[in-house]
Amino acid sequence: MTLPRSRSQSRRRSPLRQTSWLAVLSMLAAIPGTALAHSFDERYDLPAPLPYFVAGAAAVVALSFVIAAVFSRRKVGSLERRPQHGRAIAFGPLPVLLRGGILLVRALSLGLFFLVIASALFGSGDPLMNLAPTLIWIVWWVGLSLLVACVGNVWPVLDPWLTLFDAVDALARCMGWRGGIVLGLAFPRALGAWPAVALLLLWSWLELVFPLATAPGRVAFAALAWSALTLAGMVCFGRAAWQRNADVFALYFDVLGRFAPLALHPGGRGLVVRAPGEGLTVMRDSGAADIGFVIAMLSTVLFDGLRGGQAWGPVEAAFARSLPALADTNAYAAGTAGLVGLWLVFLVAYWAACVAAAGLLGGAAGGAGGIARRYVWTLVPIAVGYNLAHNFSGLLVQGQNVIPLLSDPFGWHWDLFGTAQRYPDIGIVDARTTWYVAVAAIVAGHVSAVWLAHRVALRDLREPRRAALACVPLTVLMVAYTAVSLSVIAEPMVRFLPEPAQAAFMAFGIAGFKSGDG
């Protein structure tokens, strides 16, 4: 990736500001692919060896299980299934105004979508000078995911494909087409939500494996192809069937929104305020595809961190030695195998935990399959925590690029809003803060998952002792995942070992390894 040119040649800059801007661009230009969203430009010297942090975090997660088992002996009746948990807040006389505001937001979102397509097609070929890569990979995919998880699911309002489909469908009905533009084909029941799982893995492949994911031309092609697939699916099967089974973004943001403290009341007349994660305890019993989808949410973000560290180098080398015919300069084969392989490993690990739980319960609770279907939603907080840990620094630093890019979306030296000369503040967050935010996010996500699993077990089994017994294997799995995820997130951020030993630590785990302060 070449150094981008100056954004504006009409304004004179002081030598200091120009040097600072070029330094920022030089640093960002050295980051390949979609590492733009989660890079770390300095390392933090830990005050204690990393294994102490890992062991402490794992101990906190294990202790949360003990606390949940001992202190959550509440009446089972209070955990009965209800349409919504939480406190409802009515909108009052505002629905008309809200509908008008929602229509305006949907129109603006659709207009921004067209702007992204246009900038990707006709704008600068430099990803740092083009609005499309930053808006899609950083602001939307990373930023909106965290917003939805922390606040509520706003994606149905922002979804440009849904807005475009609804607009064309409404126009067709006004023109006398009774059925609108929907063909009314039946979505194959045998497929279930597996198309969404496949598309999530494909999207992750584009983000993590494909080396030109930030190239504006490739972004335009991917966006147009994705638009064609989504709109064709809704036309053939209807928007509800497509979004329920194949619209990966609708499903992804819906799952994250279940973790959020705010939700729309089922009647649409108000909001529901609830504890974070409460919405996951009232999710429907899942199918095999739902399990695969949630596991993909976990495995893909961990693969992102793993592939960005030193431990991935030996993996690629071993892959090339074992299968030389599949080796390639861009590491497509190794990256694809790693992405799918880690997903399969997580599936097997989760299934093994469910089999163990069924064994402890003596075949009750529907066996391993029933446990797997009911408890998979409790893993979502782990995905939220790791997503925050992995992308916190990148979102704060790289996300600032959208401010000047909105004034010059095509890289044509415009300054529409007077922000084209706003330079990213790379010192907005340091490695120390990033590290402790990462530790807190990972631990909080796993503790929340343990607590939710115990809530679901207590609701289903209606006996505190058996509920605790059912959660033991899942807690062991979560403790192990805490150690692995914290080790992976630490590798590019902190200095805890000499370089060769650091790679060995990441590749082979922490068992039996004693490190110094490095």
Please provide the spans of the model-predicted regions:
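Interfacial loop-to-transmembrane junctions
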Residues: 450-478
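N-terminal secretory/membrane targeting signals
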Residues: 1-37
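Final/C-terminal transmembrane alpha-helix of multipass membrane proteins
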Residues: 387, 468-492
